[in-house]
Amino acid sequence: MNIDRNRLIGSVIFIFILVFIDQWSKYLVVKYISIGTEYLSFFGDFFKIIHVRNTGILFSIGANINSSLKNLFFLVIPIIILVFVFCFILKETNKIARIALILILSGGIGNIIDRLFRPLGVVDFLDVKFFGIFGLQRWPTFNFADSYVVIGITLFIIYDLFAKNKSTDL
């Protein structure tokens, strides 16, 4: 595999910065906000910063499964997937697709760090009102890593649907 050194260095720096922002924000939440408490509210109760922990995955799915299965499904398999994502980043020549993959990888790394080093679970702290859409008054609490993954997947889907066949290198 022929790897462009500048692309590799740029990607690693971008990943490092995103993971640092995620972990620093979680560190501040853990240090200054007790679990289960609200710290700040913006625009009435539209946006809140609160401290909760998630031992499952998206929407706390799997929070109550056996710890051996949890390690397999929430650590081992995601790490393997992230290795493949990193390989795709190194081979990808399209900037939009590469940024999307970097966002996905950075979010995955951020949450895996939590799973490895925070026994109480992944730190979630961003809480947004959802106005009853899909029956939810509030969107499930999330963190920057979760946002990176969602934005990355969305960007990649948009790229794949609309830009992929129009240009090989944006």
Swiss-Prot record:
<keyword id="KW-0064">Aspartyl protease</keyword>
<dbReference type="Pfam" id="PF01252">
    <property type="entry name" value="Peptidase_A8"/>
</dbReference>
<feature type="transmembrane region" description="Helical">
    <location>
        <begin position="93"/>
        <end position="113"/>
    </location>
</feature>
<keyword id="KW-0997">Cell inner membrane</keyword>
<feature type="transmembrane region" description="Helical">
    <location>
        <begin position="72"/>
        <end position="92"/>
    </location>
</feature>
<comment type="pathway">
    <text>Protein modification; lipoprotein biosynthesis (signal peptide cleavage).</text>
</comment>
<dbReference type="GO" id="GO:0005886">
    <property type="term" value="C:plasma membrane"/>
</dbReference>
<keyword id="KW-0812">Transmembrane</keyword>
<dbReference type="GO" id="GO:0006508">
    <property type="term" value="P:proteolysis"/>
</dbReference>
<feature type="active site">
    <location>
        <position position="124"/>
    </location>
</feature>
<protein>
    <recommendedName>
        <fullName>Lipoprotein signal peptidase</fullName>
        <ecNumber>3.4.23.36</ecNumber>
    </recommendedName>
</protein>
<feature type="transmembrane region" description="Helical">
    <location>
        <begin position="142"/>
        <end position="162"/>
    </location>
</feature>
<keyword id="KW-1003">Cell membrane</keyword>
<feature type="active site">
    <location>
        <position position="146"/>
    </location>
</feature>
<feature type="transmembrane region" description="Helical">
    <location>
        <begin position="9"/>
        <end position="29"/>
    </location>
</feature>
<keyword id="KW-0472">Membrane</keyword>
<dbReference type="GO" id="GO:0004190">
    <property type="term" value="F:aspartic-type endopeptidase activity"/>
</dbReference>
<comment type="similarity">
    <text>Belongs to the peptidase A8 family.</text>
</comment>
<keyword id="KW-1133">Transmembrane helix</keyword>
<comment type="function">
    <text>This protein specifically catalyzes the removal of signal peptides from prolipoproteins.</text>
</comment>
<dbReference type="InterPro" id="IPR001872">
    <property type="entry name" value="Peptidase_A8"/>
</dbReference>
<keyword id="KW-0645">Protease</keyword>
<keyword id="KW-0378">Hydrolase</keyword>
